[in-house]
Amino acid sequence: MMPPTRLAGTLIPAMAFLSCLRPESWDPCVEVVPNITYQCMDLNLHKIPDNIPSSTKDLDMSFNPLRNLGSHSFSNFPELQVLDLSRCEIQIIEDDAYQGLNHLSILILTGNPIQRLFPGAFSGLSSLQTLVAVETNIASLEDFPIGHLKTLKELNVAHNLIHSFKLPEYFSNMSNLEYLDLSNNKIQNIYHKDLQVLHQKPLLNLSLDLSLNPLDFIQPGAFKEVKLRELTLRSNFNSTDVMKASIQGLAGLQIHQLVLGEFKNERNLGRFDKSILEGLCNLIIEKFRIAYFDKFSEDAIDSFNCLANVSTISLVHLYFKGLKQLPKNLGWQRLELVNCEFEQFPTWKLDPLKELVFSANEVRNAFTQVKLESLEFLDLSRNDFSLKSCCSERDLGTTRLKHLDLSFNNIITISSNFLGLEQLEYLDFQHSSLKQVSDFSVFLPLKNLRYLDISYTHTQVAFHGIFNGLISLQILKMAGNSFQDNFLPNIFMELTNLTILDLSDCQLEQVSQVAFNSLPKLQLLNMSHNHLLSLDTLPYEPLHSLQTLDCSFNRIVASKEQELRHFPSNLSSLNLTRNDFACVCEHQSFLQWVKDQRQLLVEVEQMVCAKPLDMQGMPMLNFRNATCQVRKTIITGSVFTVLLVFLVVVLVYKFYFHLMLLAGCKKYSRGESTYDAFVIYSSQDEDWVRNELVKNLEEGVPPFQLCLHYRDFIPGVAIAANIIQEGFHKSRKVIVVVSQHFIQSRWCIFEYGIAQTWQFLSSRAGIIFIVLQKLEKSLLRQQVELYRLLNRNTYLEWEDSVLGRHIFWRRLRKALLDGKPRCPEGMADAEGS
């Protein structure tokens, strides 16, 4: 073992060497997309690691102490398209720092304390479209060297130290600029000269955000004849007077959308005064949006008269106190009221209005009927409404409605089948509690409906005609509902144009084989989060256009081999993740199919085994077929061994007494026999045996010694053992007394079977058959072997007559004398008798 002092002397230099290694020489970055996307965030790097390939297109180097960017800092990565250098402590960017990045489209410099920008700091960025320089100590746009970036579309210099709104001359070169974010700077005044470049060369698609600047003054006429896409002024004014004067300073502006208001956590104005918006009469506005004003009084609505010709009005997070109705002379075509608070549901009398969004509001009284005859688009989502009667022309006051959104509300009772609303193309009830929707064909008149969402509406589908009439439907979402007996029947008979169907989280356990027979155009089917136990592919066979099938988050164990052939040929994406797969040899064909279909299966690496326990969590791709071959061999060998042992046991059990007889034959083969004959007979014939057989043979001349069970068997020993050991082993011959009782006795037949084996094993053995009476052939044939023996061999037949008796006893004694040791006296007596 190495001494402690020597060990320390070895480790300390090694640790010192490792501490000197820079992270750049390791492999610290996360490879998100191989050779394309790398994330190196917050790794204490001082430069780009050497292992990053030159083919990289997306690189995140944020939160690393890069400090200074020298010339050609990124020349090794000519394919870069996105570069994030947020909070890298960058203080100096030298000339040509980004030289060679001809494909870079997004550059993020957020949170760098830049002290010096060389004139050519951004040279070489010929394709740059987005530049984010938030919180980078920029004090003036004129000193920001970006005039050559002609492809720039978005410039974000928010949260800097810019005091002047003057747009530099180089903005005239940025004809593609669409978004300029100057929010949260130090701009207080806006003068006509600041917008000189926009007067000379208008940027018609430019959206300008000046929010959170402490504006005090906008020179009247500064925006005259200026055309903008969007202007945002939120939380800019510290008083209503300043806001009113500033809005008047916007006179002459032509703008697509104007956004005014405050932010939730940046409130400067306590009350909204109707005079604030008077200056809007001097602007040409297409869309107007106002957000986060408290105490928006009823008379403040009069200020909307200056917005009478605006096409779209958005009112967000406002409190309308006492508002009952809107002015009649407004020409609005779209009205959005979102996250507002009303004391009562307002009365709408806007005849030109085509679109109404009334969403996520708080209304203290109940929903009342809407009377807007021109309305085509109605969004009443997220208001916690309860509708006792829905939905018809009488409820919504229009016959032109094409879009109806009642999602995320309370209880909605479907009392009529959309009478007068036959033009509907979009209908959304998701996460509202629907009543009576499955009682009848509620959607029958909606021949033009293309989109229907009844997800999570507590609907139990029991009526098979629930979707009758929806002949134009293309998208059906009904996740989170239930079906009778958790079985999916064919309820889509008329939905022949359906392309997307969502049946996720419906507690489905089984799917009818004909459930999808009427959906030839279906392209996407979501069956995830159900309780399916197997991958039954037969229901999907008619879906010839199916491209995506999601069966994830079920309880699928496997699929039968013959079922895997029935997937539609156009299927390109199959999701089977998060199931209860059994990685056992029984499903070997399915496991092999998973390996063969890697391109078809989504996240196949995430498909893991759930059973057996020793493989739980193991990727299915790691399952080896060789394991099954070994197991098959072991199982086959084990089964064969068990069967062999079982066969041996059965044979031993069946021929146990025959084996005992064999052992006895070997033991007694050389010795003298104790008995001349062992008598096998039925207990019903015992009188004849005692009175005739025993008396004549044992008391006759010569005398014969017979073995009889009632007299010679040893007490306490099993009957079968006595039969073999006392009967067969100690007897020269066997006398079988055949009678009707004998044939019907199981013990007699057993003894006779042992006698046959005994005769086969012992060369001296002989069986003498005595037939007491005539036997019916039908009865005798029940014992086939006995019947054959009596037909092939000579036997004695008992006749109860003087002559018959004489012949019988003479023949029997002769048979018994055969093989008996000769005795002169006995032989003489026998001859005399």
Curated annotation (Swiss-Prot):
Extracellular compartment residues: 24-632
GO biological process: defense response to Gram-negative bacterium; detection of lipopolysaccharide; inflammatory response; innate immune response; macrophage activation; MyD88-dependent toll-like receptor signaling pathway; positive regulation of interleukin-1 beta production; positive regulation of NLRP3 inflammasome complex assembly
Membrane topology: Single-pass type I membrane protein
Annotated compartments: Cell membrane; Early endosome; Cell projection, Ruffle
Domain TIR: 673-816
Residue span(s) of domain LRRCT: 579-630
LRR repeats (start-end): 55-76, 79-100, 103-124, 127-148, 151-172, 176-197, 205-225, 227-236, 352-373, 374-394, 400-420, 423-444, 448-456, 472-495, 497-518, 521-542, 545-565
Transmembrane annotation, as ranges: 633-653
GO cellular component: early endosome; lipopolysaccharide receptor complex; plasma membrane; ruffle
Signal peptide boundaries: 1-23
PROSITE patterns attached to this UniProt entry: LRR, TIR
Disulfide-bonded cysteines: C29-C40, C281-C306, C390-C391, C583-C609, C585-C628
Glycosylation site positions: N35, N173, N205, N238, N309, N497, N526, N570, N575, N625
Gene Ontology molecular function: any one: transmembrane signaling receptor activity
Subunit organization: Belongs to the lipopolysaccharide (LPS) receptor, a multi-protein complex containing at least CD14, LY96 and TLR4. Binding to bacterial LPS leads to homodimerization. Interacts with LY96 via the extracellular domain. Interacts with MYD88 and TIRAP via their respective TIR domains. Interacts with TICAM2. Interacts with NOX4. Interacts with CNPY3 and HSP90B1; this interaction is required for proper folding in the endoplasmic reticulum. Interacts with MAP3K21; this interaction leads to negative regulation of TLR4 signaling.
The name this protein goes by in its record: Toll-like receptor 4
Organism: Felis catus (Cat)
Phylogenetic classification of the source organism: Eukaryota, Metazoa, Chordata, Craniata, Vertebrata
